[in-house]
Structures are given as structure tokens and as C-alpha cells.
Amino acid sequence: MEKFQHILFFIFLLVQSPLVMCTTKSTIPVVKIGSLLWDQTEMTIADVKIFAATIAFISLAEKNGGGLSYEAGFVKKPGWTWKTPYGVIASDQEPAVHLNQKEAELICRHFGKRLPSDEEWTSAAYLEQRDNPPSGYIKLKRYQYPGGDSPRNSQCLSGCGDYKGLAPIGALNRGAGHVAAGTTLPGVNGLLDMGGNVWEWTSTERNGGFITRGASWWYGPERQQESDIESKSGDIAVVYIGFRCVTDALR
């Protein structure tokens, strides 16, 4: 009982603090964009394992026996969790899904980071801010897709890059699932998978939920555009929703 109380107190401290600087180091490389350090990829299973081992974390999807997928309405998929997104053991480099918005924020805080706001997300995803961007990108140009002028850098339902999703054959009624973090080519500002792969939670509230950005493997490239503003209930944990973390750059 005493151990359980200590765990609850630790979680309380994480939630209350605006930004908790922990000694735990993330395995995800970061990219500096303006005044923020961005995780270059979406949150991975590897990093959630680090977090989970520290505080004996059990996600809501795990407690409920599985997360959700969409099949003419949301349905619970037994055994589908952040560790097993399609019901089978996954690679550590796959994006962590089946985590709700509050869980995503808690995980970011464990690494001394946070979820980005919608404004921060769109600025990093569409506005090229590097002083000397590589060929194909122009400083201060606002792009149609997070990958640039086209969605070819992304994993989506169709019309994007030539990538093979990792869902087992027959697991899904639509699409082929996500690819591992770091599989696709860098896009605007050198970030990966801001468009497609999995939706990403933000900290911005809208219509009783939270804005998610970037679309996922479930949709075509049209949903990756900045004008597509989607919000979802903060307590939902779905196979195609993940997240990435940011922190303020040290000056």
C-alpha cells in the first residue's frame, strides 16, 4: 500500500509541475526549431518502456483489455496496447499508440518535455525555419504538407511514399498500419512523420477534446494539410493516434 501511495504522489508531482526535468534520457534525437527542441520522430515504444519501468505504468487501454480501432465505428481490440499495437509484439522503434492525451503528456513530462500546442505544431510542420535548408526546401516558405511540396515523404493510405505498414496481414480492415520511427525521409525542418504514420496529440483544447495533427496511415494525404483541424476526446486510445514531445531550448 505504501509503495502504491508513493507512485500516486510521483504522478501527482508530474502532473502539477509545468515541466519536470528528469534524469531519464530519451532515446529519440532532437531538432532545434526556433526556441524549441523537437523530438525528430514520434514517441517510440522504446521510450515508453523506459517510462513504464520507472513508475510501473499501466495504460488505460491495458486496464480495459485493449485499445480501439475503427470498423464502422470504434471497436475494442483485445490485446492491442502501446506494447502490442496490433495484438502482437512490436519493434521498440514503432510509434507508441493506444495512449490517451493525458498519458501522452505524462510520458513527455517524464523526459522533461511536454506536448506541443497546435500553434507550435503547425509552425514546425509547415514553415521551413532552417538557416540553410537542404535542396528542395526554402527558408520561410510555408509548405502544403509537412513533407514539403508533396506527401511523398509520408506513410499514408495511398498517394504518399512507397512504404510498407507493419500491421499483420488481416489485422486491419483498412490500410497497412504505421512504419517504424525513422523509416521515412525528413520533411520540413528535418522532422520525420509529421504528416501521416500516426496522428499526434497536441496540448490545445477544442470542442471538448484536444487537437490532433498530421493525419495517419488510415487516410490519404489530403488530411495532412494545415487546414485540416481534427479534435478527439482526450481519453480515447486508438491504434492510429500517437504523439511527439518538445521542450524549450536552453538559451
Question: What residue ranges belong to the model's regions?
Answer:
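Functional-site microenvironments in short loops/helix caps that host divalent-cation chemistry
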Residues: 76-97, 101-230
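Extended beta-strand/loop cores of jelly-roll/beta-sandwich
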Residues: 2-7, 11-119, 124-128, 229-251
